[in-house]
């Protein structure tokens, strides 16, 4: 995973890779952003669904590490509004939310629950719910997200 990360970082953010040896003290902050940038870089139109999972996997860690990444979240979501969430990839619990607002619902949910909800634990679990569902799809490998991006419920609906 780290190998791909390094390669992608070179392609997407040459400035960051150049500064990596110099700004080691700030490595914590830029690594955090770099993870998010890498996640977006992995979201090529072809690998739409797989990219979504990568995006989640790589962004969950930075979000837990530094809440400042939420700002990067907003920044990136405004830069790539259509690349964030294919919509149906929300699937699972997020299915109840209108798929036309890919990030709006999730981001607004995350801001409060990542900061305050993390303490209670309950709010955080609720917020990560849809994310975990999406991330588990390829791991389980039962049903490809292309069938509607619903993960586990999809096979039941198809039969």
Swiss-Prot record:
What name does the UniProt record give this protein? Putative uncharacterized protein FLJ45825
The organism sits in which domain of life? Eukaryota
Give the Polar residues compositional bias ranges. Answer: 15-29
This chain's source organism reads Homo sapiens
The ranges of region (Disordered) come to 1-29, 114-159
